[in-house]
């Protein structure tokens, strides 16, 4: 059941019930606040005989849809023509403010067999907590409604992007990836204190940590996947890593074949921007059969390491040759520990450009290049 968009351009912020949008078998209507249980609109009357929904159950949750069902007494059940569904983000469940963002969504659906699917990327975001309550209603010949009491309030959380959604992001990223440039090392910038700590407390090996919440809000790796962040960008004129970095003046460099080789798998993780012209692609490299590999295999689209638009490893004349996409900034996550003895640590000669950091960066939800038609 597709739910039509609720127009934010309400005629009167104090009279939300005036706005009704109809779409064949389904209608979306902005009702008054749930407080007091009854809607105050003059076109909706009370009728105690209508059954109140109880034991509400939410199932089949995705990033932008869910199924809802409930139980109700058979008394007057045949008089029900519509269901009123009050859906709000959890943090706004007691709010009746009509802003451009996070407008509470009240829906009216024709009474259909349960469970009923509620779908709509314009009011459902991934990985977000919501509250939902339901009324039963009977539409009268004059257009008025008689309604039941509101049900209890149920809470649920939407899901992450699925592989299908990530594949859509992948396809959009491929469009702008550009030509491939040769490279030979992965690198990771940090402060000197970071590397000192690794040597003293972690046996000279960098340890995976949980990825932050940068990028798409629905990305299944944010706050869940453990890994170590690397870059592989090169300067166009030198073919070497740039001397500037937003992450620290000390750089660990490691030969590309130490991290990316036939014994690893490559996955697409995300595609985003931060209100700038730069676009970022997150890739994950995981040793075959490792915990990180199993995590990604269940959640992320796998890429052909020898043939993709972002990062390749091919054998030429008995040697592994590496290329990266020119027109996107790659953020590479390696899912296993990496010993400092496998590479070198040295101070860079450039600047620490903090403004370019993507730590916990929020994705621009309005960018047409890197967004898909599901919750942002």
Swiss-Prot record:
Q: Where is the Fibronectin type-III domain?
A: 52-161
Gene3D superfamilies the UniProt entry points to: Immunoglobulins
Assigned keywords, A-Z: Glycoprotein, Phosphoprotein
Positions annotated as glycosylated: 23, 37
Xref: Pfam families: fn3, PHYHIP_C
Q: Which cysteines are joined by disulfide bonds?
A: none
- The modified positions for Phosphoserine read 12, 15, 25
A GO cellular-component term linked to this record: cytoplasm
Q: Which SUPFAM superfamilies match?
A: Fibronectin type III
Write out the function statement from the record: May play a role in the development of the central system.
Family, per the entry?
Belongs to the PHYHIP family.
Q: What protein am I looking at?
A: Phytanoyl-CoA hydroxylase interacting protein-like
Give the species.
Bos taurus
Q: Which gene encodes it?
A: PHYHIPL
């Amino acid at each position: 059941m597709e739910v039509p968009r609720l127009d934010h351009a309400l005629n009167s912020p104090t009279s939300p019930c005036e706005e009704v949008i109809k779409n064949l078998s389904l209608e979306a209507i902005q009702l008054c606040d749930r407080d007091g249980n009854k809607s105050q609109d003059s076109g909706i009357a009370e009728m105690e005989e209508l059954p109140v929904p109880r034991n509400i159950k939410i199932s089949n949750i995705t990033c932008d849809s869910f199924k809802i069902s409930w139980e109700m007494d058979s008394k007057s059940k045949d008089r029900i023509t519509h269901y009123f569904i009050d859906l709000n983000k959890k943090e706004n469940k007691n709010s009746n403010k009509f802003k451009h963002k996070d407008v509470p969504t009240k829906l009216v659906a024709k009474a259909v067999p349960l469970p009923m699917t509620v779908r709509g990327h314009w009011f459902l975001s991934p990985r977000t907590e919501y509250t939902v309550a339901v009324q039963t209603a009977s539409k009268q010949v004059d257009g008025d409604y008689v309604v039941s009491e509101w049900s209890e309030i149920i809470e649920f959380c939407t899901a992450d992007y699925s592989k299908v959604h990530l594949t859509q992001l992948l396809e959009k990223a491929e469009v702008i990836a550009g030509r491939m440039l040769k490279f030979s090392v992965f690198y990771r910038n940090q402060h000197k204190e970071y590397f000192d700590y690794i040597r003293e407390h972690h046996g000279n090996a960098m340890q995976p940590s949980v990825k932050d919440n940068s990028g798409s809000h629905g990305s299944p790796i944010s706050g869940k996947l453990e890994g170590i962040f690397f870059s592989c960008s090169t300067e166009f004129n030198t073919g070497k890593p740039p001397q500037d970095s937003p992450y620290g003046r000390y750089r660990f460099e490691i030969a590309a074949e130490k991290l990316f080789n036939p014994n690893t798998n490559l996955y697409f993780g995300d595609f985003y921007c931060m209100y700038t012209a730069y676009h970022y692609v997150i890739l994950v490299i995981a040793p075959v059969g490792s915990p990180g590999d199993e995590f990604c295999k269940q959640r992320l689209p796998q890429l052909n390491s020898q043939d993709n638009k972002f990062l390749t490893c091919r054998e030429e004349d008995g040697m592994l040759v590496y290329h990266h996409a020119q027109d996107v900034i790659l953020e590479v996550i390696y899912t296993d520990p990496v010993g400092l003895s496998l590479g070198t640590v040295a101070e860079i000669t450039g600047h620490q450009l903090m403004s370019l950091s993507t730590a916990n960066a929020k994705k621009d939800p309005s960018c047409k290049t890197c967004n898909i038609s599901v919750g942002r």
